[in-house]
Swiss-Prot record:
Its cofactor is Mg(2+); Zn(2+). This is DNA-directed RNA polymerase subunit beta'. The gene is rpoC. It comes from Acidovorax sp. (strain JS42). DNA-dependent RNA polymerase catalyzes the transcription of DNA into RNA using the four ribonucleoside triphosphates as substrates. HAMAP family: RNApol_bact_RpoC. Zn(2+) 1 binds at C70, C72, C85, C88.
Length: 1409
């Protein structure tokens, strides 16, 4: 008892712990926690306000109300500490024990715990092997369950209604026992022998799939009970714990009323019903009355634990559902997300931000009043230290008076004490940065303009929050890691984040443009000082081309010293003057061009790589100052005259209108269908809009001027609008097009495009109809933005949750695996160069020179800019690099596999939370992604349909492996491959471009042909899809019957008739037949596919227009039928954010394509209604077959050989199939490419490695296939690291390891299936997660960041990783020491013991004689 009291006397530092275990409490355990039983439902006495004895707030059970004072007032003061008052029974101690002492309620009848009953899957149901419905009927007294059949034929676990029971009682008498309510269930649970059940189930894992699945589930639950040592009957409560009263307070309001926690109401109900039941049982009340009371008690306990999970929720006086224990921990306002993960911070303030153009990058302006409030404790301590104030109270007065000395002290305190600024929403780590405060007048925080990009802030009323790091460690971290001048790169892409924008860009761009025949052109200057004087004197203008003598500093690689080099440079006045701010070591050539935004970004990047961080920050600041100054001097203005409407516009519009008229004519005469007409019209107008904007830009771009020789020449325009867009300061070509070109096509609310475009632009003005059409797009834009923000935030949350425990934990895992990286080429354009893909990665194997085979890079070497330049010069076109997916570190990642830390520019540090960085990098641009693919201010954008492909570079033609073609009678090559590609290679055999060619295209080039850029490689009809024969012969129709499978369509104008294949659903005949063509040779025999005995059969799809007649002779490559392509709205491509979410959730796309399960030959089997049977036979004769719906487009034909994983039925691929058939690397490539496609469309740069990190987390679980000699069950999902550890242990013992297959989980699923139950519970489905964890008696090893935040420890990342590692090492040392001491003592005791024993034996020998 004494030690217990000592506990309460002083505050004990919390114990170090390394894991948290959750379990279920037995009734004994609950009673051991309790300090007494709560017998009465009363709370406090409303006259005296003292708690009632034995009530819910009883002082005897829970502790005193006032510190060290019993309830009746007999014992007061500290000297009686620990005395229990004999009058009122209260222990004299601190009040705070009322927060930790629990009570209990002894239930008069057992009650089931609703979580184990109703949270799906029902654990009670699994253990008892009964349905939830049946258990509920028993628990709520609607039916009996047989607990002991005795000698009767009744089954144990059998359910019987009341009438059945009465009948059986009459029949068998007292032979059997059947019970109702929780007692019956409890008895059944007690009767279960877990060991025997497990044995039985392990032997029964055969039979139908449903049965196996069910048994495996049950087995898992029983194994969990066995492993955790929890007894199943504990799921039924006999004792209910009562929460300490201070955690469910009763607060007196003014006016003599009380506000109470809902829990008190719920407890009151339980106690009332419990006492009533107890009384009824004592009185031996009729069964039916007691039964009703028991049911009500069960319901009351249910509501207390989880109100509203079953039946109607219990409500209080005001018809509002009461908040139960479960509600307090789940959801956004529950314990986890509101209080543990969403704590509020003291020492913080917020205010509006304004611009601080005079600040240095690492400074921010802090209003004096705010600083005074934030730094109060520091000021107080200084005042006391200086002896100005003697007490805190006096210091407070001094500060409130605002004497001059206080302000002096504030200056002193603030010096070198960084503060953190945060702008909500904090989407990535640059949303919080540290600055050194500068005291300013006024009430707004001043922010440096260059950090706005990182905060995504602007000065239109944004607010920011200030936080003060208090401890020295916190200040140190803020200073070294978070200072704004240390964060100059975006962690998402490694691009500089301190790039100037808007007016600064405009100023720099204007100053660095050149003008033909400007004043002072051709002058030569000795140095920049002379240039400045000439400019000031008006002898030379800013844009004049001149020559200047400049000194450049280059770094000597050997010595590392700067060497000056002076030379004459051709440049302009503006650029020459800017050269003064270049840091040493950066050549002037970087600056000797018109500085657009991209160029400035490159300039800062080059400076960072060549001159280091410090010089770059200073340089960026100087650029900013100059940009502001130059923009002011430039005196830009925009007038309506600057929006030049091209004179060719009228002509283009007239041409388009004529074309539309023609299409209308064709439609009226029935040459084209309504769908085709709409498509073509939209196409014509889309093209017209593009043409107008092209001539407009061409006109804006140039202006005529007279050069020095008096000749008229064109030069780049100085038009203000053009300069703004061209420099990247503001606006885009699409916006200028709306100002001066034409607005173009608009979209309807449902996303379809209105076929009449807005031909006017904003300069000419819109008429009423045009305005009306535009309003919709504008409104939709606003609505979309709101939706998008919420969606994007949720995506980020899921991503963070799945990756939060991924931290760099070691230097090198030593793997030699990796994935091959090559440039991404699409449609002949290099979308992403090899350089961008491998920069900052680690080579996985030697990189060899393609020709000399010399080693250019050793494995394990990081590929930096210089090395990549060497590789590019050598012509390396693919490199195997290490990736996050192939890293073999168990918990976490290794630095080599991750590569460069993009935010800092060096190899990643140990302890960096790369998972969270990846999640933020993908989530942060989410708000920029469109919800739907079109809409630029409502304007519809769509690509004109491509009908040919041309080469962009010179080279040699090659085809990919799957390309196949035939030569038709005209000698043209016709493509019959579904995934054919033309590859153009240079003379070294390096791939330059790659073009997809559709089925049925005509090739205009041959293999190995040398071509020039601009050559047309292939062309095709974009509006129809052909069906082509590969072989020659005579057409023989099968099942082509008019009115049954085909319909005749007669063209009214031309009188020609065509046959159209119609849908079998609309046919009279029940027998399903598919119209097809067989080919017959001259002898009337069916043509066979060479090398097989399959006849050539070509099936027609629904909607195909048959182009040949029965008995017609056809040659190879001839078109048998055409399928018109339907309108372009039909397959809505999910674009933007939903597409990214879909990929990361690993959802199967609707209308998914089908991949070949194995390599083999295609054949078609017997058809069923509406489906085709597709078969693949592999070389060993194994057959795989699948039914494919007829409306699907089958890409293969009889006798074709396909490879495993090849697309055989058209449609988007399912990532699960890709993983199963093609493996992890292919899957990762698919997801990375698809996600990047979405972001690239918006011009957002994200490094591949972030996406790889997330794919790694999606693949972290595996499915056990064959458990070997492990304890797993086949089909069980386990963590990859866990099974690897288990297998290592098994192999060490010479046992059979478990085999497993990869499984891809969506991010939500992966977050919930994490090993850490704390993390999963705080994410989603709290109840389910906790129920499962409790049954399994799970241990949370606190590996991730989230768990540690929740339990309030330092996170195991960054500086915290070192702390935890040091602590663990120390604990291990202490443990070893303790063991050593214990062993030594034991040895000593043992040796002493042997002495004694020897002495005893001697003694006994003596006494014997």
């Amino acid at each position: 008892m004494k030690s217990l009291l000592d506990l309460f006397k002083q505050f004990t530092p919390d114990e170090h712990f390394d894991a948290i275990k959750i379990g279920m409490a037995s009734p004994e355990k609950i009673r051991s926690w309790s300090f007494g039983e709560v017998k009465k439902p009363e709370t406090i006495n409303y006259r005296t306000f003292k708690p009632e004895r034995d009530g819910l707030f009883c002082a005897k059970i829970f502790g005193p109300i006032k510190d060290y004072e019993c309830l009746c007032g007999k014992y007061k003061r500290l000297k009686h500490r620990g005395v229990i008052c004999e009058k009122c029974g209260v222990e004299v101690t601190q009040t705070k024990v009322r927060r930790e002492r629990m009570g209990h309620i002894d239930l008069a009848a057992p009650c089931a715990h609703i979580w184990f009953l109703k949270s799906l899957p029902s654990r009670l149901g699994l253990v008892l092997d009964m349905t939830l419905r049946d258990i509920e009927r028993v628990l709520y007294f609607e039916a009996y369950v047989v607990t002991d059949p005795g000698m009767t034929p009744l089954k144990k676990f059998g359910i019987m209604s009341e009438d059945d029971y009465d009948a059986k009682r009459k029949e068998y008498g007292d032979e059997f026992v059947a019970k109702m309510g929780a007692e019956g269930i409890k008895e059944l649970l007690e009767g279960i022998d877990i060991e025997i059940e497990i044995e039985k189930l392990r032997g029964d894992l055969t039979g139908s799939e449903v049965k196996v699945k069910k048994n495996a589930k049950r087995l898992k639950v029983l194994e969990a009970f066995k492993k955790s040592g929890i007894k199943p009957e504990w799921m039924i409560l006999e004792v209910l714990p009562v929460l300490p009263p201070d955690l469910r307070p009763l607060v007196p309001l003014d006016g003599g009323r009380f506000a109470t926690s809902d829990l008190n109401d719920l407890y009151r109900r339980v106690i009332n019903r419990n006492s009533r039941l107890r009384r009824l049982l004592e009185l031996k009340a009729p069964e039916i009355i007691a039964r009703n009371e028991k049911r009500m008690l069960q319901e009351a306990v249910d509501s207390l634990l989880d109100n509203g999970r079953r039946g109607k929720a219990m409500t209080g006086a005001n018809k509002r559902a009461l908040k139960s224990l479960a509600d307090m921990i789940k959801g956004k306002s529950g314990r986890f997300r509101q209080n543990l993960l969403g704590k509020r911070v003291d020492y913080s303030g917020r205010s509006v931000i304004t611009v601080g153009p005079t600040l240095k990058l690492h400074q921010c302006g802090l209003p004096k009043l705010m600083a005074l409030e934030l730094f109060k404790p520091f000021i107080f301590s200084r005042l006391e230290a200086m002896g100005i104030a003697t007490t805190i109270k006096a210091a407070k007065k001094e500060v409130e008076a605002g004497t001059p000395v206080v302000w002096d002290i504030l200056e002193e305190v603030i010096k070198e004490h960084p503060v953190m600024l945060n702008r909500a929403p904090t989407l990535h780590r640059l949303g919080i940065q540290a600055f050194e405060p500068i005291l300013i007048e006024g009430k707004a925080i001043q922010l440096h303009p260059l950090v706005c990009a990182a905060f995504n802030a602007d000065f239109d009323g944004d607010q920011m929050a200030v936080h003060v790091p208090l401890s020295v460690e916190a200040q140190l971290e803020a200073r070294t890691l978070m200072l704004a001048s240390n964060n100059v790169l975006f962690p998402a892409s490694g691009e500089p984040s301190i790039v100037p924008s808007q007016d600064v860009v405009l100023g720099l761009y204007h100053a660095t443009r050149e003008k033909i025949n400007g004043k002072g052109e051709g002058l030569v200057f000795a140095d920049t000082g002379e240039v400045q004087r000439a400019l000031d004197a008006g002898e030379a203008e800013l844009h004049a081309k001149i020559s200047v003598r400049l000194t450049e500093w280059t770094k000597d690689k050997a010595t590392g010293e700067f060497v000056p080099e002076t030379k004459l440079v051709d440049t302009t006045v503006g650029r020459a003057l800017l050269s003064e701010i270049l840091p040493k070591g950066l050549p002037f050539s970087n600056l000797n061009k018109a500085l657009k935004k991209k160029e400035i970004s490159k300039l800062i990047n080059a400076s960072f790589r060549k001159c280091g961080l410090k010089d770059t920050v200073v340089f960026a600041d100087k650029l900013l100052q100059n940009g502001f100054r130059l923009a002011t001097h430039a005196g830009f203005s925009v007038a309506i005259d600057d929006m030049l409407v091209p004179p060719q516009k009228a002509e283009i519009l007239a041409r388009a209108e004529a074309e539309v008229k023609e299409i209308e004519q064709q439609y009226v005469s029935g040459l084209v269908t309504a769908g085709e007409r709409y498509n073509k019209v939209v196409d014509i107008w889309g093209k017209a809009g593009d043409d107008v904007s092209k001539v407009m830009m061409d006109q804006l771009k140039v202006q005529k001027t007279i050069d020095r020789n008096g000749k008229e020449v064109n030069e780049e325009s100085f038009n203000a609008i053009y300069m703004m867009a061209d420099s990247g300061a503001r606006g885009s070509a699409a916006q200028i097009r709306q100002l001066a070109g034409m607005r173009g096509l608009m979209a309807k609310p449902d996303g379809s495009i209105i076929e009449t475009p807005i031909t006017a632009n904003f300069r000419e003005g819109l008429n009423v109809l045009q305005y009306f059409i535009s309003t919709h797009g504008a409104r939709k834009g606003l609505a979309d933005t709101a939706l998008k923000t919420a969606n994007s935030g949720y995506l980020t949350r899921r991503l963070v949750d799945v990756t939060q425990d991924l931290v760099v934990t070691e230097d090198d895992c030593g793997t030699s695996n990796g994935s091959l990286m090559r440039a991404i080429v699409e449609g002949g354009e290099v979308i992403e160069s090899l350089r961008d893909r491998i920069l900052g990665r680690t080579a996985a194997e030697e990189v060899l020179h393609p020709e000399t085979r010399a080693v250019l890079a050793q494995p394990g070497r990081m590929l930096d800019e210089d090395l990549i330049e060497e590789l590019e010069a050598a012509g390396v076109d693919e490199v195997k690099v290490r990736t996050a997916l192939t890293c073999e570190t168990r918990y976490g990642l290794c630095a080599k596999c991750y590569g460069r830390d993009l935010g800092r520019g060096g190899l990643i540090n140990l302890g960096e939370a790369v998972g969270v960085i990846a999640a933020q990098s993908i989530g942060e641009p989410g708000t920029q992604l469109t919800m739907r693919t079109f809409h630029i201010g409502g304007a519809a954008s769509r690509a004109a349909v491509a009908s040919s492909v041309e080469a962009k570079s010179n080279g040699i033609i090659g085809f990919n492996a799957t390309m196949r073609y035939v030569t038709n009678t005209k000698g043209e090559l016709v493509v019959i491959a579904r995934s054919g590609e033309i590859i153009i290679q240079d003379e070294h055999g390096r791939e330059r471009e790659r073009h997809k060619v559709p089925y049925g295209a005509t090739l205009t080039v041959k293999a190995d042909q040398n071509i020039k850029a601009g050559t047309i490689l292939a062309n095709w009809d974009p509006l129809t899809r052909p069906i082509i024969t590969e072989y020659a012969g005579t057409v023989k129709f099968e099942n082509v019957e008019e009115g049954l499978t085909v319909a005749k369509q007669v063209d009214e104008v031309t009188g020609l008739s065509t046959l159209v294949v119609i849908d079998p659903k609309r046919r009279g005949s029940a027998k399903v037949v598919r119209p097809q063509v067989k080919l017959v040779d001259a002898d009337g025999k069916e043509v066979k596919i060479p090398g097989t005995d399959h006849s050539v059969t070509i099936g027609f799809q629904v909607g195909a227009l048959i182009q040949v007649r029965d008995g017609q002779e056809v040659g190879p490559g001839e078109v048998l039928a055409r399928i018109p392509m339907e309108g372009q709205k039909t397959r809505d491509i999910t674009g933007g954010l939903p597409r990214v979410a879909e990929l990361f959730e690993a959802r199967s796309p609707k209308d998914k394509g089908m991949l070949a399960e194995m390599t083999g030959t295609i054949s078609f089997g017997k058809e069923t209604k509406g489906k085709v049977r597709l078969q693949i036979t592999d070389p060993d004769g194994k057959v795989w077959d699948e039914l494919v719906p007829k409306e699907k487009n089958v890409l293969v034909h009889e006798g074709q050989v396909v490879n495993k994983g090849e697309l055989i039925v058209d449609g988007p691929a399912d990532p699960q199939d890709i993983l199963r058939l093609l493996g992890i690397e292919e899957l990762s490539r698919y997801i990375v490419d698809e996600v990047q496609d979405v972001y690239r469309l918006q011009g957002v740069k994200i490094n591949d490695k972030h996406i790889e990190v997330i794919v790694r987390q999606m693949l972290r679980r595996v499915v056990v296939e064959n458990p070997g000699e492990s304890t797993y069950i086949a089909g069980e999902q386990v963590e990859r690291s866990e099974i690897l550890n288990t297998n290592e242990a098994l192999q060490a013992e010479g046992k059979l390891p478990a085999t497993y297959s990869n499984v891809l989980l969506g991010i939500t699923k992966a977050s919930l299936s994490t090993d850490s139950f704390i993390s999963a519970a705080s994410f989603q489905e709290t109840t389910r997660v906790l129920t499962e964890a409790a049954i399994m008696g799970k241990r949370d090893e606190l590996r991730g960041l989230k768990e540690n935040v929740i339990v309030g420890r330092l996170i195991p990342a960054g500086t915290g990783l070192a702390y935890h590692q040091a602590r663990k090492a120390k604990d291990a040392m202490d443990e070893a020491e303790r063991r050593a001491i214990a062993d030594a003592e034991a040895a000593e005791l043992a040796s002493a013991g042997t002495h004694d024993a020897a002495a005893e034996i001697d003694g006994s020998a003596d006494t014997a004689d």
